[in-house]
Regions:
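Partner-binding and oligomerization surfaces adjacent to conserved cores of proteins
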Residues: 1-357
Length: 357
């Protein structure tokens, strides 16, 4: 089994924001890509029901994905936020001491590349030239206090709209992707029961190592890459007791609403561009038995479809459930025979003490 704790530390610890250069983003994403190339299992399994769609997909070497809106867990890919943490950062940034530290750094020519990267439409040099040589500290403190009070009122009156935009926005982004789920094992009684029609279905074995490669697309901005710079976005699920904390995304939602209502022509600052990927790879520990790996696509920026073909890959083996009907067994056997796919049937072990097939 793969070390999911190690992957969690790597993924959650990788922060790519609006101030990161393309080179810096490439370096960070390369570490995730390297881990995935080194740790993707040789064998991954997908459990299927016997129906016309799954059998036709088998015949055509197709892997179909599903929108998160069709998943059975209501908390699937649904993050949380911590407003106290966010407000603490806001009030801290509005302290007069912090403000003067920033002014001094700007005057000395510091952090200019990062600010330009985050806010490309702003003339930073001209803004710095407009900073007076002498600043009235008392006046600045009063204005910062006024700004803090305004933000407090703004948040109080707009909070419900922020929360609505937070959940709708992030789930709309996730719904533009399609997901196919795989497991590291094919002998789980629960998996056969939940996803293969109580052993009346079948399980497909895939070799993703044979096709998983570094992406060769020359993207304009690597910072927006949610594929981890691979030709297929394939990664293990991280099982946790708590939903993923997407407070960084809530911060962007707050900015957008603030700029919109006050007609401020500024670029949005993104604190963590990998937020959506992190949400889609976080799942309740209740599902830990699945040992899931998730294949997901880039965004489909068109009309919503609950199911789509997302990859073409022939399975290397097929395992029929112990309770499969004779008719379906015959159909699957013929498909495997014609396509050169190894075919097995799961059997109950009546001699041992364990609940295994």
């Amino acid at each position: 089994m793969v070390d999911r704790k190690e992957f969690a530390e790597l993924l959650y610890g990788t922060i790519i924001n609006s101030t990161n250069s393309k080179e810096n983003a490439f370096e960070k994403l390369s570490k995730i890509r390297g881990w995935l190339l080194a740790n993707t299992p040789k064998r991954l399994f997908r459990f299927r029901r016997c129906n016309e769609y799954s059998i036709e997909a088998l015949k055509e070497d197709q892997i179909w994905g599903t929108s998160i809106w069709e998943f059975n867990d209501p908390y699937e890919c649904v993050p949380c936020y911590n407003f106290e943490t966010l407000w603490g950062k806001i009030t801290q940034s509005l302290e007069s001491q912090k403000f003067f530290q920033l002014i001094n750094v700007l005057k000395e020519g510091g952090i200019l590349p990062e600010i330009k990267m985050a806010y490309p439409s702003i003339d930073i040099e001209q803004m710095i030239k407009n900073i007076p040589d002498v600043i009235d500290e008392k006046d600045v403190k009063e204005k910062l206090d006024i700004l803090k009070k305004y933000l407090s009122i703004f948040i109080g009156t707009s909070f419900e709209e922020m929360v609505h935009r937070f959940y709708i926005g992030i789930q709309a982004e996730e719904a533009q992707k399609q997901i196919a789920c795989f497991s590291e094992q094919n002998n789980s009684t629960l998996m056969w029961g939940h996803y293969a029609d109580s052993h009346k279905g079948f399980c497909l074995e895939y070799d993703f190592q044979s096709i998983l490669k570094e992406c060769t697309q020359n993207c304009i901005d690597i910072r927006c890459c949610n594929n981890f710079m691979l030709n297929y976005s394939l990664a293990p699920i991280i099982y946790t007791k708590e939903r993923f904390d997407a407070t960084a995304y809530f911060s962007t939602v707050m900015q957008a609403l603030l700029y919109e209502k006050n007609q401020i022509p500024m670029d949005l600052y993104y604190e963590d561009i990998l937020i959506v990927s992190k949400c889609m790879l976080t799942k309740s520990i209740d599902w830990e038995y699945e040992n899931e790996w998730r294949l997901f696509t880039p965004n489909f920026n068109d009309e919503y479809k609950p199911y789509r073909k997302i990859a073409s890959l022939r399975p290397v083996a097929l395992y029929m459930g112990a309770k499969i009907t004779k008719e379906n067994e015959s159909v699957l056997y013929e498909v495997c025979k014609n396509k050169g796919i190894k075919c097995f049937k799961m059997l109950q072990d009546f001699h041992g003490k364990e609940f295994i097939v």
